[in-house]
Amino acid sequence: MTETGSSLMSDKTPDPSVAAFKEQQDRYRDTVFLPRTGFPMRGGLPKREPETLARWAATGLDEKIREAGKGRPVFTLHDGPPYANGHIHIGHALNKVMKDVINRAHRMSGYEVRYLPGWDCHGLPIEWRIEEQYRKAGKDKDQVPLLQFRAECRQYAAQWVQKQAEDFKRIGVQAEWANRYVTMDFSSEAKIVDEIGKFLLNGSLYRGLRPVMWSPVEKTALAEAEIEYHDIDSTTIFVAFPIIKDPTPAHALNGVSAVIWTTTPWTIPANRALAYGPDITYVVLRVDETNENSVVPQGAKLLVAEDRVDAFCTETGITAHHILYTLPGNGLEGAVCAHPLRGRGYEYDVPMLPGDFVTTDAGTGLVHMAPSHGQDDFMLCRQYGIEVPELVQDDGRYAPWVPHLAGIHVFKAADPVCDLLTEARQSAEHDDAPATGLMARGTVRHSYPHSWRSKAPIIFRATPQWFIAMDGETKLREKSLSALDNVTFVPEAARRRLTSMIEQRPDWCISRQRAWGVPIAVFVEKRTGEVLRDAAVMQRIVEAFREKGADIWYEADPSLFLGEGRNPADYEQVFDIVDVWFESGSTHRFDLGQEGLNFPADLYLEGSDQHRGWFQSSLLESVGTMGVAPYKALVTNGFVMDEQGRKMSKSLGNVVAPSDVTESLGADILRLWVLNSDTNEDLRIGQDILKQQGELYRRLRNTLRWLLGALDGFTPEEAVSYADLPPLEQYILHRLTELRGLIASAVETHQWVGVYPALHGFCTTDLSAFYFDIRKDAIYCDAPSDPTRRAARTVLDALHRALCTWLAPVLVFTAEEAWQARFGEDDSVHLAQFFEPEAEWNDPELGNRWEDIRAYRRLITTELETARRDGTIGSSLEASVTLPLSQEEAGIFGGLDWAELLITSHAETELLPGDTAHGGPQVERAPGHKCARCWKVLPEVGENTEHPALCRRCIDVVSA
């Protein structure tokens, strides 16, 4: 009991002193049924949770759960493999907790849940780590035998698979750990190469020269998902290309130079065309005056888009000009320019070509085309049969055959390229020729792609690579988009993101020029350059990989794979490795559809970056080889930021490691943070936020603790049937049906945002601040056989079972502790099903009435608080309340025990005549004396000579 206050004694009894009243309290203390439980107030989670994990392992809980699930409908969440490199970070924890909650909720909803954790073990990050070790030891990677290097990569990945598994277990993740998959297992490598073979045999796989994202530092192609963007300062240049072929009837382009703007001066040597917009209006302007900083020749005639004239003149220092001609974009068809470095080793004609990608948002409305270094450039030049030069080597330096620039790194080429263009301009001026070369130079700060591993900027570079065709006969793009029509997205907005990426993506470059991975195990006939498409050869490769692993490709004689009748000398054996996104995109082949796992999987759940990564690669592979999407539903979670909304980084000192949280607060706090967040959006975490979660946890724990204490000694025989329950108890049971509906909807839709905040609100607002407060008097002070007390404890039993099972998917350790505190350690809440309210408990009409009652109660408690502040009463139990009710209000609020609901000693209603103004509730000091046992103030206290300090109810209880 929380209320205190001085008592008022009758005229028959002298006013006792405070000490005397306390003596009376002590006399009856043992007759009050106060909560008793061994469930501690403090969780002590950092110490208790590892002990619970050890007990689960010792008792074989995971095996018991698997056994209990057999024969039920199967639910399969296919795990997106994290990279086996370093301890888990907060993003891993977020994702795995979300998966674990969904899995546990399905298990407790009657499903057999199959969840096999996986790891991505190949690729550049692990190579990078081993190379770092070599550099520290003064070793050169190229001097280490390839198979030794691969073995060290394998060992490194294996140790992190084990460490990460322990990290995930520590945060309460339940999975078939002994049945996990890793992409470097021999069986996995065989299935990956089998997937490659399927694309080979259906004609989708081809080798071609195309621009790809290339990391000069790592000397390999990169996938879009391996790219991150950072702001950098780049040199910008305006370059004039003299027009040498004028197709216009009026000779409007005679002596004119077309001007382009670029942020990549290093690509000028690779220029082979200019692009114009067919629907853009262009002008020929004559330069009349320039400022002192401009290098644009006066009198020059320049071609730019009409919409860009003002900006162009400002940026190049042209202060006066006049327009000579205006012409439509399609009027430029057939025009040809000279390369601005003609006469310096670049003897190329530069045709002007129509491009629908050209805009007037920036630059001049004309775009320089370097087909080796841009996707639009490549596609347009290929359409017109223009060569794709190879001028940049894999380390980012110009090749030896590049005039004037050989050996220079492209990121250091701005000055030398500008020097060459300046010489070209000066030569043209000297010869009185059309403007040529550098017209202006500047800088721009913009977002630029970098390798996520090396953090170094990347380039677009045309190299021979292996691709999977998105279009053509297999119609992979079309089929993939169609397959998504049958997929559920959470949130739904993610559908457009994935479909737009597939609509716009180029052919899939799956080759990498690295050592640690699954090789693209194919052969190319040297004479024809054609790839060998032979099912028998492919089958031999798959079987060899299954038995010996991918290393066999590097060890065995090619004849092992080619078989009899083919001379290995006639074939090129390909040693490029496959993109790790192709590997992880193959994982549906590892387990789904076999061993009782569903295919397609019921659910894939990953971060929003996986629309361009695993979600997409998995879809393309599954559709490409099996004709269907590998998933029925896709759930996306946001990224984790710090409390200020900043990205986490060591340099900012704002990194929150899961291990730090579990060691200081406990895994249940971390898990509660996940489910109290809007996981559809980016989340925030930090010390203050975790402190808030700790406070929310404390309230939930206190609710469970009070329930356990109040249920001390409860037996099924004490329970009361629903029909015999008071309306208040029936209302609380109705609220359980509402919450169960919320959970059932979350299980069905995979949308858990808001569910656990609703449960927390129920515990704090409906229970602790309302129902528990009202029923403490009955539970503490009524006789054990009293109908109200029995009814309340009947509901408390349902509340305990409901809250333990409903909280179990999130508070996996605390729910177990609260369950076993009542039912013993031989039982586990994780073997139970969700508590199911009875159908008759669902009473919306009753629920609506009690919402009105609670709203009216809040108005009255406000008046009680006012009376307490002004000294009329000390606590609510010292109050007597009169509630004037209109006829309409009486229909809702009449017939209730308002003293019970308001926790006052007396309350009565007063029916007002129809035309009487409503004066509001009246609060007075209750007449009588304070009962030493229940603390109610009642006139009857003092009537009994044997128990003069008790009320009649308490006398009956202590006398029984």
Curated annotation (Swiss-Prot):
Pfam families: Anticodon_1, tRNA-synt_1, zf-FPG_IleRS. ATP binds at residue 650. L-isoleucyl-5'-AMP binds at residue 606. It catalyses: tRNA(Ile) + L-isoleucine + ATP = L-isoleucyl-tRNA(Ile) + AMP + diphosphate. InterPro entries: aa-tRNA-synth_I_CS (IPR001412), aa-tRNA-synth_Ia (IPR002300), Anticodon_Ile_BEm (IPR033708), Ile-tRNA-ligase (IPR002301), Ile-tRNA-ligase_type1 (IPR023585), Ile-tRNA_ligase (IPR050081), M/V/L/I-tRNA-synth_anticd-bd (IPR013155), Rossmann-like_a/b/a_fold (IPR014729). Binds 1 zinc ion per subunit. GO terms for biological process: isoleucyl-tRNA aminoacylation. Its EC number is 6.1.1.5. Zn(2+) binds at residues 931, 934, 951, 954. GO terms for cellular component: cytosol. Catalyzes the attachment of isoleucine to tRNA(Ile). As IleRS can inadvertently accommodate and process structurally similar amino acids such as valine, to avoid such errors it has two additional distinct tRNA(Ile)-dependent editing activities. One activity is designated as 'pretransfer' editing and involves the hydrolysis of activated Val-AMP. The other activity is designated 'posttransfer' editing and involves deacylation of mischarged Val-tRNA(Ile). This is Isoleucine--tRNA ligase. The lineage of its organism: Bacteria, Pseudomonadati, Pseudomonadota, Alphaproteobacteria, Acetobacterales.
